[in-house]
Amino acid sequence: KTSEKRKHASELSHPFKADYNDHFETSLQAYTDIAPLLDLYAAKLGKTRKTLVIYDPYFCAGSTVSYLNELGFAIVHNTNTDCYKVWQHQQTPMYDVLLTNPPFSGDHKEKCLKQCVAMKKAWVVLLPSYCATKNYL
């Protein structure tokens, strides 16, 4: 199943250069594990899963929206756009929390974390464990 998704993602046309090895969609289980944290943050804002606005700037094949919708999160921005151009032109959609699993190749992780800090909004970034020992900022 994972290889099918990976093949599908790599066959999509993207408006940005995409490394084949970066085409791994975040699993439903990962979102299920994060959902209680999102619930706590939503409650702090006086919102629910239906009204919390989630932004994932890194598009792969589109499962982010369907998985989060399946968990009851109704407003999810994850479009097939070049997030670096979106950020450069200050066209980031309005959101309550940024939730993403950035590509692991190149300097995507660093760019992502710098943007998260610069936006001064809530964020959750899924990274491999080896990143815990790195100083990206």
Regions found by a protein language model. Give the residues of each.
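Class I S-adenosyl-L-methionine-dependent methyltransferase catalytic core
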Residues: 1-137
